[in-house]
Amino acid sequence: MNIHKSYFYYNAKKDDSEIETAIRSKANDCFDGFWKIFHRLRNDGHVWNHKRVYRVYKELKLNKRVPLRKRLPARVKNPLITPSHENITWSMDFVTDVLQCNRKFRVLNIIDDFDRVIVGQKVAPSMPAERVIRFLEEIIWEKGKPNNIRCDNGPEFISHKFQDWCKGNDIKIMYTQPGCPTQNSYIERFNGSYRIAVLDAYIFRTLDEVREITEKWIEYYNNERPHDALNNKAPMQYRLAKTG
């Protein structure tokens, strides 16, 4: 009777409970895929092999998520020159959505091109040039003034009030060419991530609900969410590593 000797040995199953707990803690507060979660675990100091983490990830059925809405085809993005430090160039753009009652609202997103930190975000029913200027003044008072602002040719940004304000504050406006969103691809990419994680993921009844969820997600985005272009560091982690 030939019986392989491995029959007499018990192969203990690895205890993956710690990995399960860690994955759940990252997956429950966002809509990230596997690699974002994996790099967040690495940034927290965990050194588990990615194959083992992915096996647990699949066992938890986190790879079975259904998209909330059909996504548009990916746009071709031209590379931009990344500034050498913060507050050289900010990029800004609007995102528009509706509340449950079909009331429209706008979100002004402002990003630092150096490290993709969101320096400001404003949720409002409308954002004329005057409100954009007031919001920029609030941010500059707290975070300092950029040398340049990159934006499209929206009516708020081409208004005489906005142009005069920028000129008076020695800020150069870097307008993108009409129909060329790739020239502002840093903020375009952020807008896409924000829409998937927040605007498409929730049904909002009030603007206060939009602000509450947005503020929570921006805190996560700036301080925890790994970014492909930042060596899989979160924007503030990258800034601290570069500037000390």
Language model regions located:
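RNase H-like polynucleotidyl transferase catalytic core
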Residues: V66-R69, R150-N153, G168-Y186, I203-L207
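Short hydrophobic alpha-helix segments
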Residues: Q121-K122
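Mobile genetic element proteins and their domesticated derivatives, centered on retroelements
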Residues: M1, F8, I23, I37, ...
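Basic, flexible linker segments flanking DNA-binding modules
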Residues: N2-T89, C180, A234-K242
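Mobile-element integrase/transposase regions
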Residues: V47-I111, V117, E130-E138, E142, ...
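Acidic/histidine-rich, metal-coordinating catalytic segments
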Residues: K143-S159, N231-A234
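C-terminal domain-tail junction helix/linker
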Residues: K167-I171, S193-G244
